[in-house]
Amino acid sequence: MDSFNPTTKTQAALTAALQAASTAGNPEIRPAHLLMALLTQNDGIAAPLLEAVGVEPATVRAETQRLLDRLPQATGASTQPQLSRESLAAITTAQQLATELDDEYVSTEHVMVGLATGDSDVAKLLTGHGASPQALREAFVKVRGSARVTSPEPEATYQALQKYSTDLTARAREGKLDPVIGRDNEIRRVVQVLSRRTKNNPVLIGEPGVGKTAIVEGLAQRIVAGDVPESLRDKTIVALDLGSMVAGSKYRGEFEERLKAVLDDIKNSAGQIITFIDELHTIVGAGATGEGAMDAGNMIKPMLARGELRLVGATTLDEYRKHIEKDAALERRFQQVYVGEPSVEDTIGILRGLKDRYEVHHGVRITDSALVAAATLSDRYITARFLPDKAIDLVDEAASRLRMEIDSRPVEIDEVERLVRRLEIEEMALSKEEDEASAERLAKLRSELADQKEKLAELTTRWQNEKNAIEIVRDLKEQLEALRGESERAERDGDLAKAAELRYGRIPEVEKKLDAALPQAQAREQVMLKEEVGPDDIADVVSAWTGIPAGRLLEGETAKLLRMEDELGKRVIGQKAAVTAVSDAVRRSRAGVSDPNRPTGAFMFLGPTGVGKTELAKALADFLFDDERAMVRIDMSEYGEKHTVARLIGAPPGYVGYEAGGQLTEAVRRRPYTVVLFDEIEKAHPDVFDVLLQVLDEGRLTDGHGRTVDFRNTILILTSNLGSGGSAEQVLAAVRATFKPEFINRLDDVLIFEGLNPEELVRIVDIQLAQLGKRLAQRRLQLQVSLPAKRWLAQRGFDPVYGARPLRRLVQQAIGDQLAKMLLAGQVHDGDTVPVNVSPDADSLILG
C-alpha cells in the first residue's frame, strides 16, 4: 500500500466511506461502505459501469443499504474506524489492476473490480447480479476506451461525449423536438456542405431568432425519418455543451483534457457523429487561461481541416464578424450558410406547424386568426426583433396568459366570496346585540347571506365544471400527441403490427373521444372561462410589450376619440384648426387607415409666443397617456452647435458618450408609442434638420450603435416662433427662408396658431384658476372668484405680443401672493372658502 496513488474520486470515496462508518458507529470500514460511497458519487463511474453489465444501480444500492443496516455498532468508541480485512484486500486488488493496465493512478473503476473480487458480502452481491470482476473489466474498457489513467481526474474524460453533449437525433426519435416548417433550401445547403470530403463544416449565420438552431433540429428529424442522402443516413447529430465542459475545470489543462476526450470519441466514431455547436463564436477563447494555453478554436482547427470532425455551427452576423473572421485560419475551415428572416406568410406557416404543440402545452385552443395576427402585428410593431421568434413568443405568451386565467379564480367568484365574508363578520357583530332594530337587521342579513352562499356555490360548481371540461380536452390532446409519436417510432423501427394497432385502433378511439369532448367544452351557456386564443389576446400582448394600442377599439375608446377635439379644446383655447389636424391624425392611426411606413403625424406649429403650441403637445400626451409628462421633449435651443447632433442619435464609436445612446433615439426605443415635441425648432443647427428627414419620411432613424429606431407610432410636433406677429403669408415666407424645401415637404401640415383675443383670454383665466384650485385642494381651500374679477384678470393679463403667459404671472401675483400672506398670518385656515373680488378703485383684487 506504500505506492497507493488514488485519483480525486477514489480519495473522495474513501473519505465518504470513513465518514459513513463513523456516523453509523461501525468499528470498521467494510466493502459495503466503499460501494455505497461509489454509488452515491456525483458524476461517478460506478453506476454507468453497472448499467454496462446489465445491472440496475438502484437495486444494488438498496441491497448494499441492507448490508450496512446489519453491520455491528460500537458505542463510546473514541478511535476512528479502520479499513477491514476485506476492504484492504479490495484496495490491494485495485492497486494491482492499475499496475497491470499501466495506469498511474488507482481510479474508481479499479476499486469496483476490487470490491467484486474475493468472498466478501459485497463481492457475492455484485457477482450474484452479474457484475463479476471479469464482466466489470470488460465494461470499463468500453466506458473509458483505450485511455490510460494519467491524471487525478480521469473520470471527467470517461463517456465525455455523453457527458458534455445532447443527442439531437435521439431527441428527434422521441418526438421531443418541435416540427420544422419550411427552410428546405437552407437544410439542403447544409447537407451539401456536410457531404464534402474536406472542410465539410457549414456555419449557419443570421440574425437572432430567425431559426438557425431549428434548421439543425430539422436536419436531425430528417436523418431519423431517413429523408437524407446516403452519406448522412444513420448519422448522429450531437449538440456540444461548451459551458458544462468549462464548468468545474479548476486546474490548468483540465478543460483541454475534457475537450480532447470528446474530440477523440468523435474521431473514433469513424464519421458517424456530426457535431453541432450553438453560439459558435464561443469556441474562440473558450478555456484559454493565459499564456501558453490553447483555446477550443485552436484545438479543433486540425481536425476541421482534415475532415475528421464534421461540425455544424450557428452564430449571429455580428458575433461571426467579431470573433470568427478575426481568425482567418479558423474562418476558412467553415462554409457560410446565410439564414434570412422569413416573410410574414412563411411565419404564418411556421406558426401553423407549431400550433398543436402550444395547444397541448397550455391546454387552450389557438385560432388561425390569432396566428395571422401574431405574424402581422409582430412584424409591424416589434421592430427590434426578428421573425419567426417574436411571433412565436407572442402566441406563447398569449396562451400562457389565458391558461393563467383558467387556473385562477374568476372575478365573479372573488367578488361574491368577499361579500359573503363581509356579511358573516356583520352577522357575528349583530348577533351580540339585543335591541329590536338589530334583530330585524340580523334576520334580513341572514336571508341575504344564505342567497349569496347559494350563488357562490352555484358559481363555483359552474367554474369547476368548465375547468374540468377544458382539462378533459387537454388530456385527450396530450394522449393523441403521445400516441402519434409512438406510432411514428413503431413505423421507423419496422414494428408494423404495433404501428397498425395504434393508427387504426387507439388513435381513432382517442380522436372520437376528443370529437365528443370538444362540443361539450364549447357548448356553455354563460362562459366564465375563455379557452380560445384570438387576435385580441395577441394584440393585448403586443400592447403590454410596446405600449402601442394594437387591439380593436373598445366602445369607450371610440367615443373618446370621436370627441377628441372637445377634450383638447378644454385646454387649448382658440386654435381649432391645429386641434382638428392633430385629432384627425390620431383617429387615422387608431382606425388603421394611416400609412404604416410613416409617423402617425408630423406637424409644425407656428405662431407668437404664449398661444398654446407647447400646451397642445402636453394636452395630446395627457389625452393619449393620462399624463402630460408622458412625451419626449427635446428643447432645440440646446442643439445650436453642429456637434450637438450626436446628442440626438448617440455619439459615434470611439467618442465619449458612445455607450449612453442618443437622447431622442433611446427615449423612442424605450417607448415607441409617444408624442415627440421639438420645441423652438428654429434655434437648432441646420444639420439637426438633416437628421430628422428620415424620421419624417420613413419613420425610422439609425442611432450611433447602428440600431434602427422605429418612429412609425409617434406623433412628431415641431414648434417655432418664426414670423410671429406677421400675416400667414409672411409666416410661411419666413419658414421657407429658414428650412430646406425637402424638410418642409415631409411635414403633414404646417399649422399657424392665431393670436388670442380678450374673449378667449377669459376662458384661459378659468383654466389658470382651475390649476391654482388643484394646488389649493391639498389644503382643502377653495377660491370663489367673481365674474368681474375674472374679467379684470383677462383685461390686465392680455398682451398681444406675449400671449397667455403674462396672465399666468398676473394670477400668481394678484391672487397667489395675497393668499400666501393670509395663510402665513393665520387669516385663512384649512377648509375655508376664500372669495375673490375687484377692489373699489378697480386697481387690484381683494381676497376675503
From Swiss-Prot:
Keywords: ATP-binding, Chaperone, Coiled coil, Cytoplasm, Nucleotide-binding, Repeat, Stress response. It comes from Mycobacterium tuberculosis (strain ATCC 25618 / H37Rv). ATP 2 binds at G607, P608, T609, G610, V611, G612, K613, T614. It is found in: Cytoplasm. GO terms for molecular function: ATP binding; ATP hydrolysis activity. Gene3D superfamilies: 1.10.8.60, Clp, N-terminal domain, P-loop containing nucleotide triphosphate hydrolases. This is Chaperone protein ClpB. Residues 392-524 form a coiled coil. ATP 1 binds at G206, E207, P208, G209, V210, G211, K212, T213. Its main location: cytoplasm. Residues 756-848 are annotated as: C-terminal. Residues 342-547 are annotated as: Linker.
